[in-house]
C-alpha cells in the first residue's frame, strides 16, 4: 500500500492536499483531502482550521490518516504563530470511527448542534444610525453578490443552488443591516408553515461586538413571527464562542447533535 497525489488539482484543491491510497495491484483503496480555512470571526481563539476527509478500506485508513496529519503539520508550520486545529466530521452514530480518532489522540468535544431559539417580544431596537431592509435577490448578479459577502464573512456552505432552493420556500427573507447607508450585516431565514430556520447571519468585522447581530436577528424573528412562524431552529458549531453568545441572547436550547467533529490542536 502506498500514497500518491493526483497530477492535477481536484475540485479546486492543490494536488499536494489530495491523497490516494493504492494497493500493490494499483487499485485505489482509499481517498483523502485536507482543506485550509482561515476563520478568525468564527473561531477567534483558533483562527486556522484544517478540515480533512478520509474514506476507504480499513486497511488504508492508518496510512491515509498519517499522511493527512503530516500534511497538516506542514501547513501549520507556515504560520506557527496562529493557533491551528485539525478536524474532520463523523456521524454521532459512528462509534467505530469515533473510537479510531480517540485512540489517535483526537478529542470529540466539538459538535454541530441543532438549536431552537426563543422568539422575543416586540420588534427589537435597531441601533442609532442604522436601518434594516430586505436584500434584493431578483437577478443573478444580486444573488452572486450575496454569496460573495457570505464567503468573505466565513460562511461558505451556501452556494447558488442552495440559495435558490431557499428562495422557493413560503417563508424566505434576507434582511440587511445598514449603518449610515453602508451594509454591515445580513441574516437569512427560510421555512414553511409555522417552522423556520436561521440559515446564516454575519456582521462585518468592524461592527462586531456592538450588539448588531442581536438587533438584526431580533428584527428578522419579529418579521417571521408576523408571518405565522412560531418555531425557529438553527445549527451552530459548539466550539464557536461568537455563535454561542448569540444563541444565549435568545435563550436557545439544544435539540440534538447533527455531527461530531473529532479534532486536535496542532499549536
Task: Identify what each model region corresponds to.
Residues 1-15, 125-157:
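Short amphipathic alpha-helix that is part of the acyltransferase structural core
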Residues 8-11, 32-41, 155-204:
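A conserved beta-strand-loop-helix scaffold within acyl/acetyltransferase catalytic domains
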Residues 22-24, 47-62, 91, 201-209:
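A short, internal acetyl-CoA/4′-phosphopantetheine-binding micro-motif in the GNAT/acyltransferase core
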Residues 29-30, 110, 183-185, 256:
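A structural microfeature
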Residues 55-130, 258-266:
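Acyl-donor-binding surface of acyltransferase catalytic domains
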Residues 58-73, 203, 209-226, 245, ...:
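Conserved acetyl-CoA-binding loop-helix of GNAT-fold acetyltransferases
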Residues 86-89, 198, 232-236:
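Conserved hydrophobic beta-strand within the GNAT/NAT acetyltransferase core sheet
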Residues 97-101, 243-248, 252:
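Conserved active-site tyrosine of GNAT-family acetyltransferases
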Amino acid at each position: 500500500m502506498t500514497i500518491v497525489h493526483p497530477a492535477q488539482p481536484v475540485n479546486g484543491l492543490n494536488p499536494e492536499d489530495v491523497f490516494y491510497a493504492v494497493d500493490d495491484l494499483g487499485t485505489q483503496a482509499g481517498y483523502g483531502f485536507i482543506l485550509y480555512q482561515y476563520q478568525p470571526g468564527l473561531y477567534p481563539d483558533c483562527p486556522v482550521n484544517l478540515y480533512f476527509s478520509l474514506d476507504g478500506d480499513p486497511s488504508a485508513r492508518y496510512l491515509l490518516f498519517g499522511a493527512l496529519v503530516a500534511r497538516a503539520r506542514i501547513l501549520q508550520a507556515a504560520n506557527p504563530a496562529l493557533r491551528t486545529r485539525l478536524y474532520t466530521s463523523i456521524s454521532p452514530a459512528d462509534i467505530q470511527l469515533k473510537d479510531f480518532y480517540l485512540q489517535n489522540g483526537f478529542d470529540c468535544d466539538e459538535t454541530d448542534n441543532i438549536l431552537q431559539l426563543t422568539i422575543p417580544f416586540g420588534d427589537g431596537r435597531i441601533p442609532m444610525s442604522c436601518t434594516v431592509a430586505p436584500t434584493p435577490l431578483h437577478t443573478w448578479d444580486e444573488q452572486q453578490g450575496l454569496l460573495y459577502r457570505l464567503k468573505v464573512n466565513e460562511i461558505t456552505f451556501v452556494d447558488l443552488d442552495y440559495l435558490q432552493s431557499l428562495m422557493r420556500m413560503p417563508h424566505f427573507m434576507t434582511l440587511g443591516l445598514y449603518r449610515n447607508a453602508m451594509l454591515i450585516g445580513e441574516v437569512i431565514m427560510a421555512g414553511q408553515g409555522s417552522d423556520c430556520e436561521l440559515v446564516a447571519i454575519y456582521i462585518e468585522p468592524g461592527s462586531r461586538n456592538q450588539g448588531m447581530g442581536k438587533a438584526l436577528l431580533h428584527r428578522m424573528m419579529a418579521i417571521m413571527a408576523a408571518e405565522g412562524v412560531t418555531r425557529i431552529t438553527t445549527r451552530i458549531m459548539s466550539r464557536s464562542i461568537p455563535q454561542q453568545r448569540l444563541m444565549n441572547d435568545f435563550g436557545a436550547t439544544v435539540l440534538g447533535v447533527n455531527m461530531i467533529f473529532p479534532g486536535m490542536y496542532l499549536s
